[in-house]
């Protein structure tokens, strides 16, 4: 039995094209997407001359249309291919059982404010005490043997609008214990001098790790997002080039520290600014615990980060988590503080994209992780990171239709994807004129996981009507539909 349709309507603010343009034929790109001669649906008929002339003589209506963005309606109905549900149900149940073994969020964590006005009286007192110790140390040259200004991440320890935020990181890392925080600060400054961090930042290091670690976009709260892709080390040539001997492991550590230092210097250390990073760790095809060189290098890097880079991680998301990682977490979990645990999020392969979307908007998530954002080196002339996307959950055995009502002549460009696909997708234009034919933009197509992750279409609209994007999910698993569109003037 078909379910009752459920509809949500929202108005999407878009850049509006001018309505005063003359009608034109459908573009060549659109013609390619239209039905062939063997299909029964045909191109929409042209508007007759009297109606066109009548439209151009009503400037009042044109003015109204100029300020009327497209209206979007999302409608859910029963799947027309529901018979496939039973065929896949048993396999999905097994997958769900495995997925349930992976822990999700291990506790709630709310990032502390970096505004001085939000500090408690005891926290303000601790900050003042730490600043006093720093002042004494500077006067007595405890940090350096020369009277030069001491900076960390390019910021002076005192007498700068950003200094308090830096000192607060050390205080929070040591639970506002002033002496412990000061000791940590001294050790960090000493290590930075020995490691020659300021010189390292300016070096031109050569590495092949641009696909292993990279920054891409921001989360919903404005934190820059760093992706760590461990599966790249399945490449034996890259692995040996990075970890085969002690010298190469040292070089790997230097490149990682340089990357982190450069990323930190782009953060906002002003009061109330964003001074932490969202870390995404992709565990897909990770070499695992058997690679002792990787394990040793990772352990060394983690220790350095904990000792010298306090409170720079907002959240640690582990995605595509394999079963063996549960063993690893069981070992290290008891040694982690509740505060550290509360920053961790885990997701298996089937829930990785959905988990990322909780924290990062789809337009900011790279295509390879279920989002719409292409590599910064690639060119996407139609969309940017600033073009927001909408998300819909397509329930098992249902069909979701996105209805975009057009009020003026324009070219509509859209991107659409369903994580993992395994659905049917079609697109069509339905004119407002009753006697006009529906135009098939994309005939029904069964999408497989091996198909292109993101579909991009465009359609020139020469009369009032609506574009319908329909996704039919016949499986027993809910899907995440993501789409966005832009309106271009003709």
Swiss-Prot record:
Residues 1-17, 46-56 have a biased composition (Low complexity). The modification Phosphoserine is found at residue 108. Its main location: membrane. The modification N-acetylalanine is found at residue 2. Residues 1-121 are annotated as: Disordered. There is a cross-link at residue 193 (Glycyl lysine isopeptide (Lys-Gly) (interchain with G-Cter in ubiquitin)). GO terms for biological process: cell division. Residues 353-487 form the GOLD domain. Residues 202-377 form the CRAL-TRIO domain. Coiled coil: none annotated. It is a peripheral membrane protein. GO terms for cellular component: cytoplasm; plasma membrane. InterPro entries: CRAL-TRIO_dom, CRAL-TRIO_dom_sf, CRAL/TRIO_N_dom, CRAL/TRIO_N_dom_sf, GOLD_dom, GOLD_dom_sf, PATL, PATL1-6_C_GOLD. It is found in: Membrane; Cytoplasm. The keyword Acetylation applies. Residues 19-33 have a biased composition (Polar residues). It comes from the Eukaryota. Keywords: Acetylation, Cell cycle, Cell division, Cytoplasm, Isopeptide bond, Lipid-binding, Membrane, Phosphoprotein, Transport, Ubl conjugation. Residues 57-69, 79-100, 109-121 have a biased composition (Basic and acidic residues). One of its GO terms (molecular function) is lipid binding. CDD domains: SEC14. Carrier protein that may be involved in membrane-trafficking events associated with cell plate formation during cytokinesis. Binds to some hydrophobic molecules such as phosphoinositides and promotes their transfer between the different cellular sites. Belongs to the patellin family. This is Patellin-3. It comes from Arabidopsis thaliana (Mouse-ear cress). The lineage of its organism: Eukaryota, Viridiplantae, Streptophyta, Embryophyta, Tracheophyta.
